[in-house]
């Protein structure tokens, strides 16, 4: 049968013939990951099931990124427990401290995930790796414990929604605007347990970082995975990351889709997701006189070098409003060093930004940028649920890097084209 991207990848990892969506299959996994919040739960389940060793010490990644640098005693205990487990099991890919970054930026940078892989992680934004052509999805810690022990897990083959983006991207409109537009169109449950498959001329024009931004937020529409065909750009990215043997592939002609959507990007303008859901999407031009006290540029969604370049281009020669805290968090040490070499860090500092280490920090209301009652933030992160970044009486707007940077300058949510 003709396969969608999701079906094609899963077929490579199972001995069962995939013939239809809804089928239950057992698949071998390429990589299993967890972080400082979810790993301790997975480790507890791993031990409870009597497992003695991980299935492959080179295909488990434990990344201490959420509450690190450790913000309090409890966070330090979580990291200590995970560190000791990693050492006991001989896990190759344990990251903490100076070599650690936000997991969904770090693993692609290190070449640990790539096209055709099946990746499971105890983190909902594991779907990020779909930008590289991997079937990647978040699981609960118990299922991740099983995958760590067995090297396999089961899936219900998801139906696929194909989203086609045509046209040429205007200035200041990027991948974040595309995925927010899609989520705004279908809702936060519009792709519930569906694979989202992205294609079209505008998708082909995106770099791999932009594709990972879009795949990252597939879960915000309820998606099981967000998938891009692996093309020449993908292979170049993976080769640069040190991978070998990857091949290009796309969905089969004649593959059956549950639903097909089409968007012409040519006339698009920057958008924001307004409180308190990622589907409450409006053009920035329609969001009038909304003041912000905090701007966050970073996260597994938009903390890569291209995002920092975009933000720096807006901030260069300008100053952050005195009423705003602008927090910039490059997503990995490698990205931090590249930003330093390019002069981006100096640009941020000259503008009056706070430049911090690679951490999830404020995205989940963990630390390094918490909102007080009545405060409002615009962020390049992926969720804006009530209380997500601090107080239940605070608000979070989601945007791309250019819009966030422009808003830092003016102190109100601002279309960067108007500066």
UniProtKB/Swiss-Prot annotation:
Q: Quaternary arrangement and interactors, per the entry?
A: Heterodimer of LeuC and LeuD.
Q: Give the binding site residues for [4Fe-4S] cluster.
A: 300, 360, 363
Q: Which UniProt keywords apply?
A: 4Fe-4S, Amino-acid biosynthesis, Branched-chain amino acid biosynthesis, Iron, Iron-sulfur, Leucine biosynthesis, Lyase, Metal-binding
The prosthetic group or cofactor this protein requires is: [4Fe-4S] cluster
Which Enzyme Commission number(s) are listed?
A: 4.2.1.33
Per the record, the GO terms for biological process are:
L-leucine biosynthetic process
In its UniProt entry, the species of origin is given as Nitratidesulfovibrio vulgaris (strain ATCC 29579 / DSM 644 / CCUG 34227 / NCIMB 8303 / VKM B-1760 / Hildenborough) (Desulfovibrio vulgaris)
Q: What name appears for this protein in its UniProt entry?
A: 3-isopropylmalate dehydratase large subunit
* Family the UniProt entry places it in: Belongs to the aconitase/IPM isomerase family. LeuC type 2 subfamily.
Q: What does the entry comment about cofactor binding?
A: Binds 1 [4Fe-4S] cluster per subunit.
Q: Which InterPro entries match?
A: Acnase/IPM_dHydase_lsu_aba_1/3, Acoase/IPM_deHydtase_lsu_aba, Aconitase_4Fe-4S_BS, Aconitase_4Fe-4S_dom, HAcnase/IPMdehydase_lsu_prok, Homoacnase/IPMdehydase_lsu, IPM_dehydratase_rel_enz, IPMI_cat
Pfam families per the UniProt record, alphabetical: Aconitase (PF00330)
* Top-level taxon of origin: Bacteria
GO MF annotation list:
3-isopropylmalate dehydratase activity; 4 iron, 4 sulfur cluster binding; metal ion binding
Catalysed reactions listed for this entry: (2R,3S)-3-isopropylmalate = (2S)-2-isopropylmalate
- Pathway participation: Amino-acid biosynthesis; L-leucine biosynthesis; L-leucine from 3-methyl-2-oxobutanoate: step 2/4
The protein's matches in PANTHER family, at most eight in alphabetical order, are given as: 3-ISOPROPYLMALATE DEHYDRATASE LARGE SUBUNIT 2 (PTHR43822:SF16), HOMOACONITASE, MITOCHONDRIAL-RELATED (PTHR43822)
Role of this protein: Catalyzes the isomerization between 2-isopropylmalate and 3-isopropylmalate, via the formation of 2-isopropylmaleate.
